[in-house]
A protein has these predicted regions:
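Short loop/edge segments at beta-strand edges and connector loops
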Residues: 100-102, 155, 197, 275-277, ...
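Glycine-rich beta-alpha-beta "Rossmann" dinucleotide-binding loop(s) and their flanking helix/strand
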Residues: 130, 134-158, 188, 290-326
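Helix-loop-beta segment of a Rossmann-like dinucleotide-binding subdomain
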Residues: 62-78, 116, 166-167, 244-255
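N-terminal glycine-rich dinucleotide-binding loop that anchors FAD/FMN and/or NAD(P) in oxidoreductases
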Residues: 47-70, 213-229
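C-terminal, flexible cofactor-proximal segment of oxidoreductases
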Residues: 205, 326-330, 339-445
Length: 445
């Protein structure tokens, strides 16, 4: 077994993994970096379709310390995003430290607070800590319906090109960004396209008044004010969703991730996409809907999202709520495990750019502080009143402000940690001839 106990392991070479590696270099934190794929890019390398473009904008997606090229359009393509991520890695000399085609299959916390990491090759190494930046766009979430569909049935992650839809009767299930992109492509190349929605969504155009919607000046205002003005703008620009045959949204805007797509409503009005309610059951190639209607399809595409899960970690190490919300403090910190960090499981309302660099810098600061503590810093955060997340959707402006404050407040956790240790030491000393057994709240790994 290879001894890497003075290093961290960074898992993933996508946007988050690369930013983490740069932050570790800047903070002089020794690390190795691995990725299961053959090159840089993460989800942009293996998980998106050939015609994909970002839905936010280049200025809300670019790294804070590495702007995108000036000649990039407002909504760069998959190929441009890959080129950008590669240029970021090369500019900061990150590539030379990445081991590609190296898949992690198990991470085991050891009693001495190190981590045993096993790879698909069978190799094992011991690390001081692990930063998991492998993303959450890989365990597909499929809907559960009665019966089986006899035609082509696949997840949006397995969609790569319009040829998969050409001259076919296509049903797309879901109203998120990928589902609506695929429905729009099916409207262009398919024989027909239907879109099944279980609930109402907020559909926003990618631009408002000539500017990317994600770059609206309104993002600096409180959410209540943003909601008021965006709803007013949508009423002027789009009208009512019911006029397109769509159900009304069943939630306030930004309570769930809005869908940014400028083509969906266009194709609905042109009759190239037909809105449908939720599916009731499959019967051969016939799909029955909850309103009693039915139709025959050649292909069903499920744009129904992903589960957040960590199969390479022992069960219970990371608690996940509702299948999509990792219970971590400060966006990455576990309560009971020192130096095991879970990155990138939240979803900004728009591009990752404003958050990924400062959050990686904050992680480096947290690691430095953990070195000065005996207790897990997550446990100290818990006793300091830091809250667990209640939604996977993050307001980037609010989160950025919080990280700026955290730069100065995090060191105060050292004092809190000393008080916690003293408190429990007093409990030990108060019990003569009885060995202190830590309660479940104080067990560390």
């Amino acid at each position: 077994m290879k001894d890497c106990s003075e290093k961290f392991l960074v898992i993933g070479a996508g946007p988050v993994g690369l930013a983490t590696a740069k932050a570790f270099n800047d903070a002089e934190i020794a690390y190795d970096q691995v990725d299961a794929d053959t090159d840089i890019g993460g989800n942009w390398k293996h998980g998106v379709y050939r015609s994909a473009h970002i839905i936010s904008s280049k200025h809300t997606t670019e790294y804070a310390d590495f702007p995108m090229p000036e000649d990039y359009p407002d909504f760069p393509s998959r190929q441009q995003m890959l080129a950008y991520l590669n240029s970021y890695a090369d500019a900061f000399y990150l590539r030379e430290n990445i081991e590609f085609s190296t898949k992690v299959v198990m991470i085991t916390p050891r009693a001495n607070e190190f981590y045993e990491v096993e790879f698909a090759s069978g190799e094992k190494r011991v690390y001081k800590g692990v930063a998991v930046g492998s993303g959450h766009h890989w365990q597909k979430r499929f809907p559960d319906y009665e019966g089986e569909f006899a035609g082509e049935y696949f997840h949006s992650k397995d969609y790569k090109s319009p040829e998969q839809l050409a001259d076919k009767r296509v049903l797309v299930i879901g109203g998120g960004n990928s589902a609506c992109d695929i429905a729009s492509e099916a409207a262009r190349v398919g024989k027909s396209c239907h879109l099944s929605l279980r609930r109402g969504y907020w559909f926003l155009p990618k631009t408002l008044f000539g500017k990317p919607t994600a770059e609206s000046f309104m993002r600096y205002f409180p959410v209540a004010i943003q909601r008021f003005f965006i709803k007013a703008a949508l009423r002027v620009v789009l009208g009512k969703y019911e006029d397109y045959g769509l159900p009304k949204p069943d939630h306030k805007i930004f309570q769930k991730h809005p869908t940014l797509n400028s083509e969906l409503l266009h194709y609905l009005k042109h009759g190239r996409i037909k809105p449908r309610p939720d599916v009731k059951k499959f019967e051969g190639k016939t799909v029955h809907f909850v309103d009693g209607a039915s139709d025959i399809f050649d292909a069903v595409v499920c744009g129904t999202g992903f589960y957040v899960s960590f199969p390479f970690l022992p069960e219970g190490v990371v608690k996940v709520k509702n299948g999509n919300l990792a219970m971590v403090y400060a966006g990455c910190v576990l309560e009971k495990h020192k130096n095991l960090y879970i990155l990138g499981t939240t979803q900004p309302r728009y591009g990752f750019g404003p958050l990924v660099t400062p959050s990686s810098q904050m992680l480096a600061q947290i690691i430095k502080l953990q070195d000065e503590m005996e207790l897990p810093i997550g446990l100290v955060m818990k006793h300091s009143g830091v809250k667990l997340p209640d939604s996977h959707l993050v307001d980037p402006i609010f989160a950025l402000r919080q990280m700026k404050i955290a730069k100065y407040t995090l060191p105060l956790l050292l004092r809190k940690e000393k008080k916690l240790r003293k408190k429990h030491a007093e409990k030990v000393n108060s019990k003569e001839n009885v060995m202190f057994q830590p309660n479940s709240d104080m067990q560390v790994y």
